[in-house]
Amino acid sequence: MRSNGCGELRSKHIASNVKLCGWVDRCRDHGGVIFIDLRDRSGTIQITVDPDQGTELFASAESLRNETVLQITGLVRPRPADAINSKLSTGEIEVLANGLEVLNPVTGNLPFTVSIHDEEPVKEELRLRHRHLDLRRERMSRNLQLRHTTIKTARHFLEDEGFIEVETPVLTRSTPEGARDYLVPSRVCSGEWFALPQSPQLFKQLLMVGGLERYYQVARCFRDEDLRADRQPEFTQLDIEMSFMDQEQILKLNERLIAAIWKAVKGIDLPLPFPRLTWHEAMDRYGTDRPDTRYGMELNDVSDILKDMGFKVFSGAIAAGGSVKCITVPNGNDLISNVRIKPGGDIFNEAQKAGAGGLAFIRVRDSDEIDSIGAIKDNLNSKQKAALLKQTGAKAGDLILFGAGKTATVNSALDRVRQFLGRELGLIPTDQDNKLWQFLWVVDFPMFELNAEENRLEALHHPFCAPNKDDLGDDPDAWMERLPQARAQAYDLVLNGLELGGGSLRIHNAELQRQVLQTIGLPLEEAKQQFGFLIDALEMGAPPHGGLAFGMDRIVMLLTGEDSIRDTIAFPKTQQARCLMTQAPAGVSNHQLEELHVESTWVDPE
């Protein structure tokens, strides 16, 4: 039907007869000659329709609407020197049409313009409602082609490393850990339910028990959770698992995988190995386990310096088991007013969103003099001031912002303020140097965190992470006592403050798995009911194994420079988990519900 893609033609094709298919991007009449920009996935080419080629051909071209689907036959020729368009890859040539067939006309009104020549922004709601049209836009086509290149590169890399692709079930059982499941009622097994998988976690471990040794899958996963710009109810993971490899080997292999993707997509050679921080280091220095290391303003714990200070907000927080931390804003005296730090100010509001009651501040003046509220200035002695300025590195003109209280709240508040100021003050580099892509492994996570509401431990990642051998010891009788303080052999890959993926070495000892489930409050009978198939498998010669999963939607978002993963997915959902194009989710008939033995109790408030 066609000989070439529109965007494939170059000067080497001059004097060739070609047959092209595509959409009318725009059509214009210049002095009795009609120029059609014909667009397909590969790009755009200028078609020239001269009346000398026939009146019927010219009349057909005159009546064309944008987005009409055409087939063009013609001769490739050079453009006149004054008509060369350096912005187009095909800008040195054009096609003189000698045949034109309308394959499908546009009969309705277009809700927005698709043309590459129209930079008019379109509301996202309208784009999502007419996604089939939105996908024709150059930006969206480019994003999806880049997504394809990313996944193709990953597949080739893993296959070259001896991995095989295996599909795991989409209809599985609900488990108590993790986010809320999407549930699917079974018609055949009345009263019972499937769950859509949040990840292939258990199945990929069972594949290792089954002796497949190296597995990967481009997996569809589902989580019924509140959404934000980089979350979707259904998403794509590059899921990887391997046997007989230690943590160091797994990290190095996946560094090479990421480097291969960045080389193929961006043409960038990433420096290897990636830096590493322990979880405790990340929390101490950045207040988060997903630190953005492209800029400074790291957190400083100044509790030891200020613990005996007369300012009760500081000394009281420390005495209660909390901490006082600060960040130093370079030249902050000139950039940030007191109004912004006090209640109602934008910086105060950022801290408050993280649960902090407020922020304290010190302004550093010449000769190490300081300005602050009286309660701080009057209660900070010269020794404390000297130690504070030395530890923070603050100099004249700098602003020190303090958080005081529970350490977790202080970390969260100062992390939020740090990110806010990093963006606002232009501290984040945007040029194409190594600082643009700051990869980082965060390792040595705690096995568990406290659920204060329920007064019980929860797995920080999931309950299948293997604990650190040094923390656990070799005596199974001591495991229950040591587990709550143990570190997990877990690792997350972070890029510019965003988590790209994470994983761990897995528990391959059945007794240890039972004890971990007990530690998170799962009774043995319930553990057997929920995870008996896994524990049985671990008793049948399970090999040491581990793996990880990368969020492909987020990776593609970063590679394309988009702000939302919705612009890297062909048919995404909104932040209300709706598809505006198909109007899913939607109601179903009573007959369908009756077949499933399901009754809806929903009452429409209208």
Curated annotation (Swiss-Prot):
UniProt KW Aminoacyl-tRNA synthetase keyword: yes
Record EC number: 6.1.1.23
Reactions catalysed: tRNA(Asx) + L-aspartate + ATP = L-aspartyl-tRNA(Asx) + AMP + diphosphate
Subcellular location: Cytoplasm
CC terms in the record's Gene Ontology section: cytoplasm
Region (Aspartate): 201-204
Presence of keyword Lipoprotein: no
Site positions per UniProt: Important for tRNA non-discrimination: 30
Cited Pfam families: GAD, tRNA-synt_2, tRNA_anti-codon
Keyword annotations: Aminoacyl-tRNA synthetase, ATP-binding, Cytoplasm, Ligase, Nucleotide-binding, Protein biosynthesis
Record SUPFAM superfamilies: Class II aaRS and biotin synthetases, GAD domain-like, Nucleic acid-binding proteins
Primary location group: cytoplasm
GO-annotated molecular function: aspartate-tRNA ligase activity; aspartate-tRNA(Asn) ligase activity; ATP binding; nucleic acid binding
Gene3D superfamilies on file: Bira Bifunctional Protein, Domain 2 (3.30.930.10), GAD-like domain (3.30.1360.30), Nucleic acid-binding proteins (2.40.50.140)
Group of enzyme by EC: ligase
Binding site for ATP: 223-225, 232, 499, 551-554
Residues that, per the record, bind L-aspartate: 177, 223, 461, 506
CDD domains: AspRS_core (cd00777), EcAspRS_like_N (cd04317)
Signal sequence annotation: none
GO BP term, example: aspartyl-tRNA aminoacylation
Subunit relationships: Homodimer.
Summary of the function given for this chain in its UniProt record: Aspartyl-tRNA synthetase with relaxed tRNA specificity since it is able to aspartylate not only its cognate tRNA(Asp) but also tRNA(Asn). Reaction proceeds in two steps: L-aspartate is first activated by ATP to form Asp-AMP and then transferred to the acceptor end of tRNA(Asp/Asn).
NCBIfam families: aspS_bact, PRK00476.1
Protein family membership: Belongs to the class-II aminoacyl-tRNA synthetase family. Type 1 subfamily.
Record's protein name: Aspartate--tRNA(Asp/Asn) ligase
Organism: Prochlorococcus marinus (strain MIT 9313)
